[in-house]
Amino acid sequence: MKTLLLLIPLVLTACGTLTGIPAHGGGKRFAVEQELVAASSRAAVKEMDLSALKGRKAALYVSVMGDQGSGNISGGRYSIDALIRGGYHNNPESATQYSYPAYDTTATTKSDALSSVTTSTSLLNAPAAALTKNSGRKGERSAGLSVNGTGDYRNETLLANPRDVSFLTNLIQTVFYLRGIEVVPPEYADTDVFVTVDVFGTVRSRTELHLYNAETLKAQTKLEYFAVDRDSRKLLITPKTAAYESQYQEQYALWTGPYKVSKTVKASDRLMVDFSDITPYGDTTAQNRPDFKQNNGKKPDVGNEVIRRRKGG
């Protein structure tokens, strides 16, 4: 029972996860980060359901969240030496004796037939000698455990990389081609496809327990897409989302290792807010007013003004 009570503070004290500032895109990527960003992007794009566009010629419009940012992450891996440390110090008793020199002073006073002699003894204000005696034993004991990490959590400054956006756009075009959907310039298209990429970046985190430690790097890609028939203004694909994340993790014991390295790709949480539940206003007076009734199985159409704005015209 005593051993258990001693281990509980050791395991629970200073436990937590330090998460670095997320950054979109990135500057000079290292190989693992490239692999994760590519994996999450490919998985999200691959999940897009484009069956309604079979045999069509599509104009593709991709809008990506700004990929410029910077963060400063400082601090190294913690050392157990600061948490497990003890010492014992004992000094013997000490006594000091001081010897002050003494001197005599004689004063004689005469007046006619009378005279007097005064003698006094004084001590100097500074000792002539000092003697110190120690009694008892002197001892000093100390104990400690020091476990340092293999490196510091270095500073990061991530700059914009427009090639990330170009890479993602090319992936989307590749999937369209492999699905049998032709991507053409807007003037030759019969369908407009809009893809909005809300999340496209990496997140670093560190978990520090006394016995277990981990370094984790995640890459996330989250996007929303819909398609519009250019002639009828009908929604061929209502707003849908695709979200995936990839992860690289190194696990340590007392920052020794890593004893395990893992890579995973999985579906992540969807967008916090999407447009799948938006319907046209019932009292709109705009030209090409959508004809839409909830739960009637029909798809809303989209007016020319909406298309023009999405194109940036």
Curated annotation (Swiss-Prot):
A lipid is attached at residue 15 (N-palmitoyl cysteine). One of its GO terms (cellular component) is cell outer membrane. Residues 1-14 form the signal peptide. Residues 282-313 are annotated as: Disordered. Residues 282-297 have a biased composition (Polar residues). Disulfide bonds: none annotated. It is found in: Cell outer membrane. Induction: Induced during interaction with human epithelial cells. A lipid is attached at residue 15 (S-diacylglycerol cysteine). Keywords: Cell adhesion, Cell outer membrane, Lipoprotein, Membrane, Palmitate, Signal, Virulence. GO terms for biological process: cell adhesion. It is a lipid-anchor. Belongs to the MafA family. Present in outer membrane vesicle formulations which are used as vaccines in human. This is Adhesin MafA. It comes from Neisseria meningitidis serogroup B (strain ATCC BAA-335 / MC58). The lineage of its organism: Bacteria, Pseudomonadati, Pseudomonadota, Betaproteobacteria, Neisseriales. The gene is mafA1.
